[in-house]
Amino acid sequence: ADVGPRLFNDAKPANAEIIDCRGQVLAPGLIDMRVFTGEPGAEHRETLASAGASAAAGGVTSFVVMPVTEPVIDDAALVSFVARRAEATARVRVYPAGALTHGLKGTQMSEIGLLKEAGAIAFTDADRTIASSLIMRRCLAYAANYDALVIAHAEDPALAGAGSMNEGAFAARMGLGGIPPAAEAMAVERDMRLVELTGARYHLGQVSCAAALDVI
């Protein structure tokens, strides 16, 4: 629909319904690129239907399902299942992402071509970083052959250790293990080099520090 202050010459038609939107936000439907659900495998926690209802309530009209499920979405049949199930039960558009590596273990590349053919719109190991640069290069190069999008979580796992938030005074006050900005910046730097090398389509799942922005 058209919107704007000068949409009508006389400000508003005589028969127009006026909806007071003061204090509200008018925007296109939001898209969430990183949603974790319980279905398949943990429907007691959350289903595609309940996730879709929550999304709709918050103004999200489309979301991408991460492959962190039980079993992991690293098989064409599971991609098809998620797509069909979401279409039948969810109130919003749901797009399945396939696992970039088998079992999200970061050691063996998934069948990207078959997963994309089944309906996967992107490939990711979700909140896990592929530690091996060789495996990451192979994944990006193979994905490039299919014009497939790779979504990455960039964080050097060895340097991040058991940290749970960015390193700093707030983490110290909360008694939480900190993650140095270098852990993210180093991983982003590696991925940027590999993207340049392979020509793959790449989406950085999250950026949480200025050091990573400097690399980008």
Question: Which residue stretches match the model-derived regions?
Answer:
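Alpha-helical scaffold segments that flank or form the walls of functional sites
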Residues: 24-25, 41-94, 102-121, 137, ...
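Hydrophobic faces of well-ordered beta-strands that scaffold small-molecule active sites
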Residues: 29-35, 63-65, 94-98, 122-124, ...
